[in-house]
Amino acid sequence: MAARLVAELVKEGVIKSERVKNAMLKVPREEFVTPEYRMMAYEDRPLPLFAGATISAPHMVAMMCELIEPRPGMKILEVGTGSGYHAAVCAEAIERQGKVYTVEIVRELAIFAAQNLERLGYLGVVEVYRGDGRRGLERHAPFDAVLVTAAASEIPKALVEQLREGGVMVIPVEEGVGQVLYKVVKSGGKVKRQAVTYVLFVPLREG
């Protein structure tokens, strides 16, 4: 099932690198969905979790992962843990060499994600925190990459500050016409942002 989905994403040009391809093959998406959706785990669509959250569609996880150009040794911040699937894919994409810090505002989701990641052996590479991800995680900054999995009204200043020079942020932002996924590169203390595609994410919560 995973192999067929990944082959399709490679064919469509969503997956471009061996690292992301291997990561998508290794992480069992069915372990990160609620029981009633296990049979749909390898459909290329978002699925409901609980507390108003969703697990992103596989093509979106792959696309966002490709945009940060993963490599061993990276330190990644994820804002919006959900069930932990995206963090696990990032961990595999950096070959479990480095660190993924992920912040979830909903307590029940943070617990659910931590349980999933622990069961599958990711704790140690992935650390789950409960809190307002818009504020980042200053104690572990700077980050090589920041991934935001919910739509922000604007790019949070704290996340830019916690991005290292040359680092990349991938973030969906609410625009007048809808949501746009941006690749943001920090250079010379300033940010350059490039629109990637229109997207549809749940809103980034405040807390």
Curated annotation (Swiss-Prot):
One of its GO terms (molecular function) is protein-L-isoaspartate (D-aspartate) O-methyltransferase activity. It comes from the Archaea. Signal peptide: none annotated. One of its GO terms (biological process) is protein modification process. This is Protein-L-isoaspartate O-methyltransferase. It is found in: Cytoplasm. Its main location: cytoplasm. InterPro entries: PCMT, SAM-dependent_MTases_sf. Keywords: Cytoplasm, Methyltransferase, S-adenosyl-L-methionine, Transferase. The active site is at S56. GO terms for cellular component: cytoplasm. Pfam families: PCMT. Belongs to the methyltransferase superfamily. L-isoaspartyl/D-aspartyl protein methyltransferase family. Catalyzes the methyl esterification of L-isoaspartyl residues in peptides and proteins that result from spontaneous decomposition of normal L-aspartyl and L-asparaginyl residues. It plays a role in the repair and/or degradation of damaged proteins. Its EC number is 2.1.1.77. It catalyses: [protein]-L-isoaspartate + S-adenosyl-L-methionine = [protein]-L-isoaspartate alpha-methyl ester + S-adenosyl-L-homocysteine. The lineage of its organism: Archaea, Thermoproteota, Thermoprotei, Thermoproteales, Thermoproteaceae. It is an enzyme of class 2 (transferase).
